[in-house]
Each structure stands twice: as C-alpha cells, then as structure tokens.
Amino acid sequence: MGRRKIEIKAIKDDRNRSVTFLKRKGGLFKKAHELSVLCSVDVAVFIFGTNKKLYEYSSGDMRELITRYTYHGGATEHKGPSDFNGGDDDDEEEGDGTPPLDQPMDAHMMPPHFQGQGPFPPHVMRHYTPSASPPIPNGVPFPPHGHGVPRGHTPQPQMLSRPGSRNDARRMGQPMGPQGSPQVNGFGFGQQQSMYGPPNTTMPPHMPPQMAPGPPFPYPQHPQHPPHPPHPPHPPHPQQPHQPQMQQQFIEDGRRATMPANFAPHPPPPHGPMGMQRHSVSPPQQHPHHVPQLPPQQPQQHPHSSPPQPQHHQMQSPPQPMVKFESPQQIEPPQHQHQQQPEPQEPRPEQQQQQQQSQQSQQPQEPQSEPARSLPPPPPPLEVKTELAPPAQPGRIPQPSLLDTAVKKLPRQKQHSIFTPIDENRSILSQNLAAFHAEPSKNKSSPPAHHRSSSVDESTSNASEASRGKDKDIASSPPLLKRADPRASISSVSSAPESAPAPPSRSNSLRAGPPRPRLKVQIPDEQSEDGSGSATAESASSAQGGASTDATSQSTRQNDSHSSTNMVLPPPSPSASALLSAGATGPPNPFAPKRPPQHPAPGLNIDTPVSALPSRFLNNEFLPSPSSFYPDWNFRGGDNNTLPSPLNFATPVVGTGPSFLRDENPGASLKRKSPDNLSIHGPISDNPLEAGNEPKRVKVDS
C-alpha cells in the first residue's frame, strides 16, 4: 500500500503550492528535530518562502551554527538539486548515505553547480550572511569601533527579512556567479586573508585594505562620499580592473555576483587552501559587519547610500566582504565623517535642548546665550525660528527668549521663573508658560490686543501708532512671538536682579528702530491710563522708568494674554501698585476670572439646576417632580408597598396563569376586550385584567 509518489516539479496552483509548502515545511522541521535529537547533532534549516518570509529551525543558537559554518574548512558532503533530480521522494533516505563521494562530487559538481550551488550557497549564505556574519564581527571587530556593534545587530533583521526575494535574484544570477566568483577568489580572498588576520588585531588600519576590495562596489558610492576615493588607490592592484567588472555585476546583479563569489569559496573548500579562503571569507564578514555600521550611518546623512545598503543586504552572501570592504572604506573616513557628522545631527536636537536650557539659565548672561543661539540655528527648523529672532537680537536679553521660545518656550520661561528671585513672578511665569504657548497662536490669529495697545498709545503718540500699524502689517506674527517672549525675558531679567532693569531699558533703546513701537505698544497697554509719560519714559530709556515700565509691561502683557487666553493669574508683586492703579485695564481681567469662580460658586450653588445639586434635588424637588409626572409610580416607589404589592400581584398572576390555560379571562386581559369579557365574567374578569396589567407594569418598571 505504498504512498503514491508525485512528480517533483514546480506546483503552479497557488493553493496547492501553499498547502504543500506548509505540510512539507513542517515535515522538514520535524525531521530536522528528530535528526538532531536521535543523532545528537546540530541542525539548522532556513526556508525563504515565496512570500518573502523567512522560516527557520535550529537545534541550537542559529548564530552560533552560522558562525561555525563560516569558519568550517569545507563541507564533507554537499547536495544540490541535481542530486535529487531522479524524481524519487526525498523521504527515501537510503540513497543519501552513499554520496560521501560528494567531496569529489564538489570538485566535479562545482562548475555545473555554480548554477546548482547557486541555490545551495545562497541558502547557506543567506543563512549565515544575514544573521551569522553580523554577529561574528560584532563580537570581534566591532568592539574597537564600538559604533558598529549595535548597528551591526540592527541590519541583521534587515538581512534576514530581505534575503528571501534576493535569493531568487541570486538564483537567477547564478550564471553571473562563475564570473564574479573567480574574481572574488583571486582578489577578494587574497585581500580577505590580509584582511582576515589584521582585522581582529587592528580594525582601523585594515580598513584601507578593506577599502581596496571595497572600491569596486564603492565607486558608485564614492561620488556620494568623496573621502572614499583616496582609499581606492590602496587596491589599485589589478584587482581594481576586475573589481570594476564586479562593480558592474554588483550594480546589475550584485546579489548574483556575490552569490557566485561565495560559491567560489565553497568549491575550493575541499582543497586545503580553499578552506583557508573560507576562513578568509569569514573575516570579510567581520568587515561586512562594518558594513552594517555604514548602512545605519549613511542613511542618516546620505540617502544615496541607502540604496547601496539594500545592495549590501542583497550581497548578503560572502561577496558582502566585497561590499563590506567597500563599506569599510566608507566606514573609516565616512564612518568617522558620518558618525561625526550624523552624531552632531542626531545629538543636535538634544544638544540644542541642553543648550537652550543652558541659555535659559544663561539668559542673564547675554554673551553665553548668544553662542548657544548660533548653535541651535543649524537645524533648518531652528533656522526658521532664528530668522524670527534676529530683529529682536538688538535686545540681547530678549533674543534668548525668542530663540528658546521659538524652539521651546516652556522650558526657558520655566527656567526664567526659576532663576528670577521675584516671589510671585515664579508662579506667574510658570502659569504664564501655558498662556504664552496659547498666546502666540492667539496673538497671531488675533492682533486686537496690539490694537488695544495702539488705541491706548493714541493718547501717547500718533506717529508711533502709524509705525506700529506698519510693523503689525509687515510682520505681525513674528513680532507677536517676540513680544510674548520679551515679556518673559524682560520680567525675568528686570525683576531677578534689581540692577538688571537697566539692560531691559537698553534693550528698549536698542529696539528703538522697528521694535521700539512694539515694546511701547505692549507697555502702554498697562500704563495707558497711568499716563503717556510712561511710554515717553521708556523712549527716554531712563533706568528707573525703564525698570518700572518693564515690570508693569510684563504684568500688563501677561494680563492681556490672560484676558485673551482666559487664564487667571495674579499680577507680579513688584508691580502690584502700578497694576492696581492701572487695574481698570489689565489686573481686573485676571482677577475677574478668579472672582467669578469664587463668587459664582455660591451663586451657581443657588442658581444651579436642582439636578446639579444632589442634596436639594433629593430633598426638595426630586420626589415631588416624579409624583407630578407619575403619581402611580410615586405611590409605588414612595410607599414601599410596591415591593409586597408585586408579590401580591404575582400571586394573582399565578391566578391569571390558569386564565392563560386558555380561560377567556386571560385572552380578554391581554386583548383588553373589556366590554365582552366584563359582560361574560362580570367583576371577576375586571380583577384579573387589572391584576394582569399591574403586575406587568411592575415587572417592566423593575
């Protein structure tokens, strides 16, 4: 009753193919497990499905098995598709034991098996290159670099994920393999050997030799990375002309060429020196590990390098050493360059944050904040925001706030509140942080606050109003941001040290050009009622007048912002008197919102609907209102007789039960044909009707 043997050929039906794949994959893994347990051997199985998914089984650590494979001298037995083309089921393992001749078979089979091995080494190479090669160098060569270790690990999953489709490409490229392989054998391995010994000792010096093999593939990359071209001279040996050919192959069929290159080491392994070449292959893998470093690094700065990265992954086979050599070239100069450059790029946001924080702390120290200012601009977003800042630069102190606020308004202002010794300003500024965030948007959306200031200024100076209107029209949004920011900066500077008020006045004098009207516009907002003399005092930039006007302007600006943002904040203590005098405009706005919640709280308690207040709701109106709506329910719910009553009704319901036994009473009760039923059954029918209706109601209610 032997099983029916099927013809071994590609299955065209997708459904049948998927089912066969699942069943045979499971059987293969099961067989591998049984083999590993029964014979105490290590087994690793890789399957790259047509869906580009990787399936694997390993009796132990997959990476260890792959590393062992890479360092192994050569396969004592190798099987290829041609060995099983007889059409017999693979289940018959009898024939498998005989071919220890495969070593000579390897020698003989290799020329044909560049195609045959195309799939074989791809499987093997797929296996070890994606996962094994990165782990090996990560453990050994990368420690000197240190950078590559995590990066080497990161590309591994990519290597694993990508190989599936690329394996197919490699299979397609198998004919290309023999061409690439001899080149790799002649050149790649010789250099790889040199690479092999030294890389473990000193990776950076070996980078140039790696660079030498690298140039074939890096040439396309060298235009991207000029530093690499100097390294190509290291390999200028005849290898380079062959390597350009390899480059073409890599470009056209990098995956394919690399696969044959890998294959080349496999055919020689039976020979002793070729085994050594494999060992040499493994070190390039170490260097390939450097390659993984490049892919993360390069993508940071050079998107162009990212396409070669897929090539690296495509190269997953030992040719990766080729790519890896190339990459090491890029790695040494570019790694340092990329690492140095991308590191500043990556840390820049962090450094910028730190710098901004330091600037916030340094804002009292104007020169320090300025260099930091120069640092944040390099990122484009910061540059845009710094562009807003330059007009405020004449005011040295406000600049940090502008830059910081442009980047991060909250932390600096918070720090302002922290550094400022003002008692109440701390809390106010901390509260204003949210207000300031809302303010720039609200100010941008609504310049009426500025119009208020202009209207107030009308009493002070009409010419200044015209200039202010022009300024508003020219750039209302940036000055708004700056205005909101200078408030915090001025408040922190002027209030923090008493000697500081002079610098704010200086900043006002410096801002005398276009920004002066802006500052004046904001300041008279508070002091408009106090008198136009305050604005003139600021224009005069007297130290005392400047200090008082700055403090008041801060408070009023904050008040205006609060009025716009509906934020309730107390005025700063130092300017409390001025605020009280000007209280008609600014201060009452913040106090008004506070007081309404305080006073209306009782008012709301009185005016609030009964539903809002449970006590009153229950005591006064709740019970009577339902009584008015549902008198029956009130009697039932309030009397507490409803509980027993439903029980009592339940018994009559039982009585109605017999009526349901097709007595006419229940039919009458259900259909409510009272006139007929009443005439027939008299008052008894009435009772069951009422009883039946009531208990039903009770049930629905309950």
From Swiss-Prot:
InterPro entries: MADS-box/MEF2_TF, MEF2-like_N, TF_MADSbox, TF_MADSbox_sf. Residues 132-144, 201-241, 587-600 have a biased composition (Pro residues). Disulfide bonds: none annotated. Disruption phenotype: Leads to reduced aerial hyphal growth and conidiation. Does not affect appressorium formation but impairs infectious growth. Residues 73-608, 658-702 are annotated as: Disordered. Keywords: DNA-binding, Nucleus, Transcription, Transcription regulation, Virulence. One of its GO terms (cellular component) is nucleus. Residues 145-155, 273-284, 326-343, 350-371, 487-512, 530-553 have a biased composition (Low complexity). It comes from the Eukaryota. Induction: Expressed in conidia but not in aerial hyphae or conidiophores. GO terms for biological process: positive regulation of transcription by RNA polymerase II. It is found in: Nucleus. Residues 1-61 form the MADS-box domain. Residues 86-96 have a biased composition (Acidic residues). Residues 693-702 have a biased composition (Basic and acidic residues). Interacts with MAPK MPS1. The MADS-box domain is essential for the function but dispensable for nuclear localization. This is MADS-box MEF2 type transcription factor MIG1. It comes from Pyricularia oryzae (strain 70-15 / ATCC MYA-4617 / FGSC 8958) (Rice blast fungus).
